[in-house]
Regions:
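Active-site-adjacent C-terminal substructures of enzyme catalytic domains
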Residues: 236, 246-363, 375-381, 387-389, ...
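Conserved beta-strand scaffold positions in the cores of enzyme catalytic domains, especially
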Residues: 4, 55-59, 171, 395
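Short peripheral tails and domain-boundary helices/loops at the edges of structured domains
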Residues: 392-406
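Metal-associated gating/positioning segment near the N- to mid-region
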Residues: 60-123
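Generic structural signal for hydrophobic
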Residues: 131, 199-200, 226, 230, ...
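N-terminal metal-binding scaffold of metallo-dependent hydrolase/deaminase domains
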Residues: 1-51, 380-382
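Metal-coordinating catalytic core of metallo-dependent amide/deamination hydrolases
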Residues: 108-125, 137-247
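Divalent metal-coordination and catalytic microenvironments
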Residues: 8, 36, 41, 62, ...
Length: 406
């Protein structure tokens, strides 16, 4: 069946099937008084002026249309919440003080271990639907709140169930998220490499393997061992790095051939060069910097140096309980100094590339899956400018409306 989306005030899209870098990241195809033709869930054509005939039609009412957003870094499967930590943060308590009071990541680990798979699935499904309503049509979800095999498997089974129901969900094994309480650090790294990664791979539960390479967590050497072990078992490397301090994570990501390196709040010139030379996508997480009142990172410098940049929510219960990728886009423009055109590419094409889905998602081009959003905005600048409310008027996946305000 053919469906035409017509009366599009502005159609804005990145182009291509690989991450855009440098000047290309800020170069969009922009059409006015436009239409888009979808056939059997796939984009067939687009243009300006009089739309073609079709079996069905959608009046976009002169509004902005973009590709569906791709959130390439989330921690969506978790037990409990941590709102009780807010007062401690406002009182100036450090992370270590919050941890000592029974909070922090290890409190989420306890809650996640205690939750049933079905309870986690229902909670995660609800969060996914909220993200979908804000324009996110594909995403990545990490484990990392188990820190032992049974719970890591449980988290990744939840991700698999979500993928089976909705499609376009990438799974990342993040057993190297933190060290379990009372565990010898070297022994845990060995456990990850020799037992947990092989078991996760045998179950076919993860597309990617990630580690938190930073001060006080996993060293550069430990992170590299974990990522290489994952790579041997078919998991594509990703990395959390330079959120707290530079300890060589960007260089690790380049050496192991990581698809992305994320956070990067403290990355300097040498790290930027390593990312560029290694062909690694830099993922900015500005909503995390906003919530933690931490540096946003030199993503302007990264784009100018030719590093492809993606943007994601980092949705998690501790450092950014935010489901809205459009909010992260606005923060990325205001504090990461990206242009609206660059941030749209970051949230669509480059986000898709960071989870290996750019061949089918991330742009409104013929042959791509018809995932698109009609925004309650007249143009791209207005979408970024009018932050603070959900401006996704209608969300379509494979050409079918899945959510919207009307």
């Amino acid at each position: 069946m053919k469906r035409v989306f017509y009366n599009v005030g502005e159609l804005a899209t990145a182009t291509g099937s690989a991450a855009a870098a440098g000047r290309a990241q800020g170069t969009l195809l922009t059409l006015h008084n436009a239409w888009l033709l979808e056939e059997n869930g796939v984009i067939a054509a687009h243009g300006e002026g009089t739309p073609p005939q079709a079996d069905d039609s959608v009046d976009c009412r002169g509004k902005l249309v973009t590709a569906g957003l791709v959130d390439c870094h989330t921690h969506l499967v978790f037990g409990g919440w941590r709102e009780h930590e807010l007062a401690m943060k406002l009182a100036g308590k450090t992370y270590l003080e919050i941890l000592a009071a029974g909070g922090g990541i290890l409190s989420t680990v306890r809650e996640t271990r205690n939750a049933s798979e079905d309870a986690l699935y229902e909670k995660t499904r609800g969060l996914y639907l909220e993200m979908l309503a804000h324009g996110t049509t594909a995403l990545e979800i990490k484990s990392g709140y188990g820190l032992e095999l049974a719970t890591e498997r449980k988290q990744l089974r939840v991700v698999r169930r979500l993928k089976e129901e909705f499609g376009d969900v990438a799974a990342t094994f993040l057993g190297a998220h933190a060290f379990p309480e009372g565990t010898d650090h070297e022994a845990y790294v060995e456990l990850l490499c020799s037992e947990m990664i092989p078991a996760i791979a045998e179950d076919g539960l993860a597309d990617f393997c990630d580690a938190f390479c930073d001060d006080g967590v996993f060293s550069a050497e430990q992170s590299e061992r974990v990522l290489l072990a994952g790579k041997r078992f078919g998991m594509i490397p990703k990395l959390h790095a330079d959120e707290i301090r530079e300890i060589g994570g960007t260089q690790v990501s380049a050496r192991v051939g990581a698809i992305s390196c994320d956070h990067l709040s403290e990355t300097g010139a040498e790290g930027i060069k390593a990312l560029r030379d290694g062909g690694v996508i830099a993922v900015m997480l500005p909503a995390t910097s906003f919530y933690l009142k931490k540096p946003y990172g030199d993503f302007r410098g990264m784009i100018d140096a030719g590093v492809p940049v993606a943007v994601a929510t980092d949705m998690n219960p501790g450092s950014t309980p935010n489901l809205s990728l459009p909010f992260a886009m606005t923060a990325g423009c205001l504090y990461g100094r990206l242009t609206p055109e660059e941030i749209l590419t970051a949230a669509t094409l480059n986000g898709a590339a960071a989870i290996g889905m750019a061949e089918k998602l991330g742009t409104l081009e013929a042959g791509k899956q018809a995932d698109l959003v009609v925004w309650d905005a007249d143009n791209l600048d207005q979408l970024i400018y009018r932050y603070g409310t959900n401006r996704a008027a209608a969300v379509f996946k494979k050409g079918v409306r899945v959510t919207g305000k009307e």
